[in-house]
Amino acid sequence: QVNFSPGWGT
C-alpha cells in the first residue's frame, strides 16, 4: 500500500 498525498496505491 503506497498512499502519498492523493489516493494512489489504495
From Swiss-Prot:
Which domain of life does this protein belong to? Eukaryota
Where Pyrrolidone carboxylic acid occurs along the chain? 1
Gene Ontology cellular component list: extracellular region
Which InterPro entries would you find in this protein's record?
Adipokinetic_hormone_CS
PROSITE patterns linked to this entry: AKH
Question: Where's it found, cell-wise?
Answer: Secreted
Q: Which UniProt keywords apply?
A: Amidation, Hormone, Neuropeptide, Pyrrolidone carboxylic acid, Secreted
Please provide the Gene Ontology terms (biological process) for this protein. Answer: neuropeptide signaling pathway
Q: Does the keyword Repeat apply?
A: no
A GO molecular function assigned to this protein is: hormone activity
Any keyword Transferase?
Answer: no
Give start-end ranges for the coiled-coil region(s).
none
Q: Which residues carry this modification: Threonine amide?
A: 10
Functionally, this protein is described as follows:
Hypertrehalosaemic factors are neuropeptides that elevate the level of trehalose in the hemolymph (trehalose is the major carbohydrate in the hemolymph of insects).
The record's similarity note reads: Belongs to the AKH/HRTH/RPCH family.
Query: What's the protein called, per UniProt?
Result: Hypertrehalosaemic hormone
Source organism of this protein record:
Nauphoeta cinerea
